[in-house]
């Protein structure tokens, strides 16, 4: 059989009657059963073609699959229509800056009204010299052992803002009971102005509900 016929036979392009018998003869294998054709790699193993799944040269198989397709090289080299096109250069390479939604509450700055409004002049009058609350002090005890300091300030006639926010509930409750008893014994007043914040007022200091509200709104932390 000529080389051309062998090539045609290998690719299955030659008619069955043109095949020579040596393509079907195997030394250790009998002829294929009637109606059954051996796989191509088995039929042509004797002609120098290795069977599928061989382990002899794995690098050859890697070379077949690792080579990038031709079109990738074209795109990398600036092929028209790719991402290197001038149409996409600025859009793809420059980071896009997304539009930011303006703050929803920006227009409300400086426009607080009502009970939460700060009146600097009113607060100055509330704590100005000669006012009953002019010498007010804020104490932030860490535990019950500081009850003595609260009692001494109150006994000297100083209004005391008692901030118990940093205390645990058990000690805070003990200190509230102490302050309430102290105010009762010295004929003063004991009022709540915020959560875990109380105002102890001596007997000669009359603090109205409006003044207590202003103290809470102005931020009692500013008055030491």
Curated annotation (Swiss-Prot):
Region described as Disordered: spans on this chain: 21-78
Subcellular location: Cytoplasm
Ranges of biased composition (kind: Basic and acidic residues): 54-66
Family the UniProt entry places it in: Belongs to the SepF family.
Protein name: Cell division protein SepF
Keywords: Cell cycle, Cell division, Cytoplasm, Septation
Function: Cell division protein that is part of the divisome complex and is recruited early to the Z-ring. Probably stimulates Z-ring formation, perhaps through the cross-linking of FtsZ protofilaments. Its function overlaps with FtsA.
Domain of life: Bacteria
PANTHER family: CELL DIVISION PROTEIN SEPF (PTHR35798:SF1)
Complex and partners: Homodimer. Interacts with FtsZ.
GO BP term (any one): FtsZ-dependent cytokinesis
GO cellular component, one term: cytoplasm
Major localization listed first in the record, in broad terms: cytoplasm
Organism expressing this protein natively: Mycolicibacterium gilvum (strain PYR-GCK) (Mycobacterium gilvum (strain PYR-GCK))
